[in-house]
Swiss-Prot record:
It comes from the Bacteria. The gene is plsX. Gene3D superfamilies: Isopropylmalate Dehydrogenase. InterPro entries: FA_synthesis (IPR003664), Phospholipid_synth_PlsX-like (IPR012281). GO terms for cellular component: cytoplasm. It catalyses: a fatty acyl-[ACP] + phosphate = an acyl phosphate + holo-[ACP]. Pfam families: FA_synthesis. Catalyzes the reversible formation of acyl-phosphate (acyl-PO(4)) from acyl-[acyl-carrier-protein] (acyl-ACP). This enzyme utilizes acyl-ACP as fatty acyl donor, but not acyl-CoA. Its EC number is 2.3.1.274. This is Phosphate acyltransferase. SUPFAM superfamilies: Isocitrate/Isopropylmalate dehydrogenase-like (SSF53659). Homodimer. Probably interacts with PlsY. It comes from Synechococcus sp. (strain JA-2-3B'a(2-13)).
Length: 374
């Protein structure tokens, strides 16, 4: 198992990215390909390199503030080289921190979409009261959606829960403002009708915002605009509760004693609510395993992102998606079975990324400048 890691992406790159990658290498026993400028990476790496760690050179990187389409203007950027590691079968998955739009664009340009998928979706795992995660998608890849897109999100999410989380019959919910089938806007109404008639998934009806973290649903689908707002709100909940406990519990000698007695329990509460434990979000619908994590990721979150990528690769989620995502209701001649351009939103509005438009000098990735020591 080998994971390609864009070591130049994120606010704390490359130091924190490398720390997390080295931790994953030691604890998960997985090979790591660190992609970036060698002169920037080497100061943070042990010498000689541990067995299983390689450096793959990249001349450029795409910054957090740059437009997603910079991946097309920078064909030798680390995010592109990382995706090409997967495309050429030199890596089983890729982990990228930093510019989410750039990571999505690079994945599409280098890996392409799966047949039967109109729009890839970003799926994030969130903690629930029942101790099992819920998969929320889309959380930012598509701010405007059609009912057909949400139907595909539901199918991909259900397959992920079956393959990776081991849930035999995942309960799929549609995020809405009410439980009744006649609630919601035009998108919600049309999507509800499609999901209710969709074979192969267990559609459990509408999910209100208060239902997402209860554990009643295994998959919750929505458009990327709503999903991204909900994701960031959910991530803040744990931080707010932790901060309130830190401020209120130590007040007075009784509070200090209570803190000492409850310390193991409080640590467990923090662990259950900490989004860092879930590592990142999977980009489902592209022809490769890609995990996108926060631009503010430090070593622990990078470690968990690599763990998430490893689990997805081991459970062969990509092969299941490749085999089952083509809609049997659509004839072979339907253009939706073939790859079409993808819109990526930038500061100047939506722009089209045609597959294959990225300049490539070779069909293979650069060879590592330093191989692992035997």
């Amino acid at each position: 198992m080998r994971i390609a890691v864009d070591a130049m992406g994120g606010d704390y790159a490359p130091e924190e990215i490398i720390k997390g990658a080295l931790l994953a290498h030691r604890q998960l026993r997985v090979g790591i390909a660190l992609v970036g400028r060698p002169d920037s990476l080497k100061p943070f790496l042990p010498q000689p390199l541990p067995a299983g760690i390689t450096i793959v050179p990249a001349e450029e990187d795409v910054g957090m503030a740059e437009e997603p389409l910079m991946v097309r203007k920078k064909p030798k950027a680390s995010i592109n080289i990382s995706m090409q590691q997967v495309r050429s079968n030199q890596a089983d998955a890729v982990v990228a921190a930093g510019n989410t739009g750039a990571a999505m664009a690079a994945a599409y340009l280098n890996l392409g979409r799966l047949a039967g998928i109109d729009r890839p979706a970003i799926g994030a795992l969130l903690p629930t009261l029942k101790g099992k995660p819920v998969l929320l998608l889309d959380v930012g890849a598509n701010v405007d959606c059609r009912p057909r897109f949400l139907e595909q999100f539901a199918r991909m999410g259900s397959l992920y829960c079956q393959c990776v989380l081991g849930i035999e019959k995942p309960r799929v919910g549609l995020l809405n403002i009410g439980e009744e089938p006649n609630k919601g806007n035009d998108l919600a109404l049309a999507t509800h009708q499609r999901l209710a008639q969709l074979p192969g998934i267990h559609f459990a009806g509408n999910a209100e915002g208060r239902d997402v973290l209860t554990g009643e649903f295994d998959v919750v689908v929505c458009d990327g605009f709503v999903g991204n707002a909900l994701l960031k709100f959910a991530e803040s909940v744990g931080q707010v509760i932790t901060q309130v406990l830190r401020e209120e519990l130590p007040r007075g000698w009784r509070g200090k004693l209570g803190c000492w007695l409850l310390r193991p329990n409080l640590k467990q509460v923090k662990r259950r609510m900490d989004y860092v434990e879930y590592g990142g979000a999977l980009l489902l619908g592209v022809n490769g395993i890609c995990v996108i994590t926060h631009g503010s990721s430090k070593a622990p979150m990078v470690y968990h992102a690599i763990r998430l990528a490893k689990e997805a690769a081991e459970q062969k989620i990509l092969q299941r998606l490749q085999a089952e995502m083509v809609d049997p209701r659509e004839p072979e001649s339907n253009p939706r079975r073939r790859t079409r351009p993808l819109q990526v939103y930038s500061g100047s509005g939506p722009e089209v990324l045609p597959l294959g438009s990225l300049e490539r000098t070779s069909s293979r990735c650069p060879e590592p400048v330093e191989d692992a020591q035997p």
